[in-house]
Amino acid sequence: MQHPHGVQPWGNFLLNGGADIRSTGLGQLRVLSDDLLLTVLGLLPAKVLLSCSATSKALYCFCNHEELWRALTLQEFEGSFRYSGSWQHTYLAAAGLTEPGSQPSCGPLKVQGLYSDILYQPWFCATTPIREEWLERDNLERRSGLSLEDFRQHFELPNRPVVLSDAAKDWPAQKKWTRKYLRKAFKGQAVVAGNYPMAFDDFLAYSDGATDDMPLYLFDCEFAAKAPKLATDYKVPEYFAEDLFGVLGESARPHHRWLIMGPPRSGSSFHKDPNATSAWNAVVRGSKKWILFPPHITPPGVHASADGADVATPVSLVEWLLNFYDAAQRGGVRPLEGVVRAGEVLFVPRGWWHFAINLEETVAVTQNYVSSAGLPAVLAFLKTGRADLVSGCAEADRADLHERFVSALREQRPQVLESC
């Protein structure tokens, strides 16, 4: 496949030579790096950006870069848009500059002689097929019919991941949660996708048409309040029934459960779960590829600050797979990885780095929790008093979360507090 504007990676110029239209096409802007040029263009309003795109073939390619129009759309309209095949056309329709649902009168202009990794790479990551070698390795332990004691002794206490292959297979959600059912459940409600409130039908339209290298995906911690019947369609697996944050009450505890839905290639880049909690993730429809590293091994390509407050990762999940998956296999500690499918539940222990990419449109439920086994780690984390590291609750409630949690435990679960 060829980039829609004919842009090629910089390596092609180094290998093959030929004309380079960048310098002549950018004029005095040629002194700027591609990255800095896009930053400058990102400061322009849409109409100026369109005018600039008509000045030269080189600027045409930069000004039509999809990431610029995605940023403009989300900045100006947040989630109030209907995706229309490209981010530029989506913006123009949302701004009333074109008719909603109309198609561009002509296709994209293809140029020759423009070489830019920053323009080429997002398109390449969005269109390159998911490779079989990224999926074939499966060394996650899988168990069915596991007793509570076996789970505790073999997985929870040693802090080891496991796929519980039958933990969600009998949920009503497995049969109920079709698009039609979810559309009805969320009627009149906005869901959260990419941190923006969006009508559920608009999210589905985006999901069907998105060509992003890192697609937006639905990640909503208030789904049960917005669509109460969804909360009755699943049951917390017995292995995770103890959740000590519950002593704070639903309104005072950190956010702990989310509905997740997204198109292929959407998902979450490497991170550790908040507040030193453990988590479980149940796939209702679709499938997810998971990669996990133990707490003391930072994944290749990931750069974390000493306190964990800041984590830098590649922009897209496919970019990490392209650039770092092979390196991960050659490292001293290989990751645990595998595909989790509908009806299966992955236990993600506290502190583990994890990455998940949807292989198809996928719907899942995930919850973070604090068990007796995990309580010492959570209390130690909260005791630091670092409000900037606490997440899932109002900023004003973060600094004293440790104090409030201990007080509630002392009143409601004193034996657990004494034994930790």
Region annotations inferred by a language model:
Residues 2-38, 42-345, 355-420:
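N-terminal accessory scaffold of Fe(II)-dependent oxygenases
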